[in-house]
């Protein structure tokens, strides 16, 4: 794939690395590529970040035909810039595209585009501990048409945002609300796809959870309303009686890149891993029996997020005395160690940006 590069003549000022936050600061450049039916993907380019000029009838505004991804670039102490399993994000992009009638992007083109735009803006990658460059690839439908049908034109873009450490004061357990009123997704729907509608549907429950002092929502299945599925921005794991248990992918759960990494590492560390149905009632009983030993989420933003408290209806479960568990800490140290080049990547997961 040939990528035309046009660099900005007015580079922005680099931000204070002690106050980056998440998703509010953007680098100088972006990647763009267009799709036209009968031609395919074309005109790949890296240009200065700019506002988009779109007709108000563009289909993305009306029927939500869009998708997005999320990954990061990390600058190690050795000065090298690494991506973490970008091929997995590329493959997941195409799985989402299949469900939403969006054309595939070749995996190698996706990875090449990510590497190219990160290379152009590599001076924006922060160096402070725990910081990274968040990468947001996304595709929107651009046909100017009010009929309900797949668009014939699309725009693929990648923007970059330097991000602060998720745990500014160190790894800490969070409280999670198990939602039993609203539903995020159902089998046969779009739960496995990374598309905006899933996140918009989560907002009401998220606001309710925040109002009650919980940081995130843990969703139940949309049919029986009793089986654990995923957290709003993470997959979920439990250590029950020595075994690592996580909900099986069933079409309504996002197949997380970090989730897959956790499963592989747990097996390598010698922990038995079960991918299966888990009911909220099973968690309550395990906690009462002293067998719910640990709970943690996994995702790109936090990597590993220990859970110290779960609330389901009138039951509040305190897990591991609201402290970080052994498995959570080992996984966090291992994955972040690989990402930042602190430990050897014997899994072959990192891709260097040169």
Task: Label every PLM stretch briefly.
Residues 1-18, 25, 227-354:
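Conserved catalytic-core subdomain
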Residues 55-71, 301-305:
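Conserved phosphate/anionic-ligand binding catalytic regions in large, soluble enzymes, centered on
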Residues 1-55, 61:
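Intrinsically disordered, low-complexity, positively charged segments
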Residues 34-41, 67, 74-79, 86, ...:
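Short acidic-glycine loop/turn motifs at beta-strand connectors
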């Amino acid at each position: 794939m040939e990528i035309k590069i046009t660099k900005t003549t007015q580079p922005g000022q680099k931000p204070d690395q002690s106050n980056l936050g998440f998703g509010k600061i953007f680098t100088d450049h972006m990647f763009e590529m267009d799709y036209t039916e009968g031609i395919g993907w074309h005109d790949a380019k890296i240009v200065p970040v700019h506002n988009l000029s779109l007709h108000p009838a563009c289909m993305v505004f009306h029927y939500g035909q869009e998708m997005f991804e999320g990954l990061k670039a990390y600058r190690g102490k050795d000065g090298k810039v690494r991506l973490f399993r970008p091929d997995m994000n590329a493959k997941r992009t195409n799985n989402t595209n299949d469900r939403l009638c969006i054309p595939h992007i070749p995996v190698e083109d996706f990875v090449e585009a990510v590497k190219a735009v990160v290379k152009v803006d590599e001076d924006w990658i922060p160096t402070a501990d725990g910081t990274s460059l968040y990468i947001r690839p996304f595709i929107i439908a651009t046909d100017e048409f009010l009929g309900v049908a797949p668009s014939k034109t699309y725009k693929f873009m990648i923007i970059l945002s330097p991000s602060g450490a998720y745990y500014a004061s160190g790894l800490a357990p969070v409280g999670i609300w198990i939602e039993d009123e609203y539903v995020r997704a159902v089998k046969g729907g779009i739960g496995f796809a990374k598309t905006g509608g899933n996140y918009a549907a989560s907002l009401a429950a998220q606001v309710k959870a925040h109002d009650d002092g919980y940081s995130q929502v843990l969703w139940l299945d949309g049919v029986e309303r009793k089986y654990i599925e995923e957290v709003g921005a993470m997959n979920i794991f439990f250590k029950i009686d020595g075994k690592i248990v996580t909900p099986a992918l069933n079409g309504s759960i996002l197949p997380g890149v970090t989730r897959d990494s956790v499963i592989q590492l747990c097996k390598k560390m010698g922990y038995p891993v079960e991918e299966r149905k888990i009911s909220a009632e099973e968690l309550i009983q395990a906690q009462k029996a002293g067998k719910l030993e640990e709970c943690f989420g996994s995702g790109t933003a936090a990597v590993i997020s220990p859970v110290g408290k779960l609330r389901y209806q009138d039951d509040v479960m305190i897990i591991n005395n609201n402290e970080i568990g052994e498995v959570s800490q080992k996984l966090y140290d291992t994955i972040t160690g690989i990402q930042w080049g602190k430990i050897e990547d014997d899994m072959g997961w990192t891709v260097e940006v040169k």
